[in-house]
């Protein structure tokens, strides 16, 4: 670990914050077109107050996914039930929902609790009320023992199960995001933070009086690469989020920027200007061996790995303006991908490798866009302003990005089809440079 100058104080710590969301998610568009679902409050089978209501987490997750719209609790024809035996199909005949989530929580000794839940096919119950046994209505049912500290985590797990069973797509509710918070009035205004995807369980990894930027997750979700100016110059670090051990990977003169892990987690694609113009390089994290990828008089920057690890998506000005290109590592062959709009930059690749997400500038407006790599159809997803830094959820359904709202930098989210939109404001300061973790 590098010895810092006397003028600098950098705080490295994992500092768990109070149990509240540091980033509040405000849904702004798309809930009306979501699929209706019913989540019955889980039944508490103990004495005294329940530690936490898991069903609140499930309802919030499903609403924030943009795919589902949980029904209001007061509109449900049955409440206080937790098993199929208590489910009255006839009472739900007119309920506009495709499934019902219900469950129970009971003490299991010490600080442990037994949580049970069932996912009921309401469409089948309504269409064929007498043609099958009651058990045929159960899409999934599970029970597990957890501690009080695991209530939110297990709520996310239930949401993952519900989402995958009803959509066929793996849920991404047990994921995290990394981002940079800036409070200009503080002595050390820059903080590298991580939190659950919904803003809860926020932790600070690094605090510095100098800028921090461009966090990027390793494929195993255990490390972050980022750029720090803590030594009054740009340097790239890799830090283990659990042990706090970190390594200085590059510290060349000039630009050291835009780090992103390779799919195997052994290398970083980075932007360096050590040889003149900003170019894209690949750095072996263990050996520090460097391979130059691009060699052009124009600026090449912002690399992102395709899932096979054989090529990179980059932003290049070799055509006169920033556009997205694909460069193959073995051959060096490079091809331009984007042509619409004035600029296209800051690209990310969907987990399936079939589409790219990026910042598009048209008529002077910066918005998040998506392009299908086979058809080359481009769709602008957002209508906010000064959008930047898109990062895709590991299941490919949502994009988190930086934008400006009421004069402040905030985070926002949009579904991959552009239908659902949400804003993630923070209580104090500004937030930027989001990065969505892999599945954890």
From Swiss-Prot:
The protein's role, per its UniProt record: Part of the Tol-Pal system, which plays a role in outer membrane invagination during cell division and is important for maintaining outer membrane integrity.
One GO CC term on file: periplasmic space
Signal sequence, renumbered to the chain: 1-21
Subunit note: The Tol-Pal system is composed of five core proteins: the inner membrane proteins TolA, TolQ and TolR, the periplasmic protein TolB and the outer membrane protein Pal. They form a network linking the inner and outer membranes and the peptidoglycan layer.
Native species: Shewanella halifaxensis (strain HAW-EB4)
Pfam families tied to this protein: PD40 (PF07676), TolB_N (PF04052)
Keywords: Cell cycle, Cell division, Periplasm, Signal
The UniProt record lists the keyword Manganese: no
Official protein name in the record: Tol-Pal system protein TolB
Family indicated by similarity: Belongs to the TolB family.
Protein localization: Periplasm
Chief subcellular location: periplasm
GO BP: cell division; protein import
Top-level taxon in the UniProt lineage: Bacteria
Keyword Cell cycle: yes
